[in-house]
Amino acid sequence: MSAEVPEAASAEEQKEMEDKVTSPEKAEEAKLKARYPHLGQKPGGSDFLRKRLQKGQKYFDSGDYNMAKAKMKNKQLPAAAPDKTEVTGDHIPTPQDLPQRKPSLVASKLAG
């Protein structure tokens, strides 16, 4: 057992030496982390931004807001009952079917 402990220690030392030798990038990274500790944090923005994002859906412009508002109204209002028996579109009007226009009381300035 005493022989295993030095081997484990030497293996750890070898890993540390390899890390130091093979990765100067890690050394530079450690220097930068020491100099700028706040840059290592996860991105998330300010507290204000996080709070605004947690609030929920926000609208891009007034059109989006009005469309969402109209959808909510359509869901809340029940469908209108067909009380009227009037049918639209069963007769196509012709010029003879239309009533005559009444002449205007005010003379047109274009007529002269």
From Swiss-Prot:
Domain of life: Eukaryota
Compartment annotation: Cytoplasm
Modified residues (N-acetylserine): 2
Tissues with expression: Whereas isoform ARPP-19 is ubiquitously expressed, isoform ARPP-16 is found only in selected brain neurons.
Keywords noted in UniProt: Acetylation, Cell cycle, Cell division, Cytoplasm, Mitosis, Phosphoprotein, Protein phosphatase inhibitor
Basic and acidic residues bias: start-end ranges: 12-32
Residue positions, PTM Phosphoserine: 2, 23, 62, 104
Region ranges (Disordered): 1-49, 74-112
Record-level Gene Ontology MF annotations: phosphatase inhibitor activity; potassium channel regulator activity; protein phosphatase 2A binding; protein phosphatase inhibitor activity; protein phosphatase regulator activity; signaling receptor binding
Pfam families noted in UniProt: Endosulfine (PF04667)
Up-regulation conditions: Up-regulated in denervated skeletal muscle (at protein level).
Keyword set includes DNA-binding: no
SUBUNIT field: Interacts (when phosphorylated at Ser-62) with PPP2R2D. Interacts with SNCA. Interacts with PPP2R2A; the interaction is direct and this interaction inhibits PP2A activity.
Protein name (database record): cAMP-regulated phosphoprotein 19
Source species of the chain: Rattus norvegicus
Lineage start: Eukaryota, Metazoa, Chordata, Craniata, Vertebrata
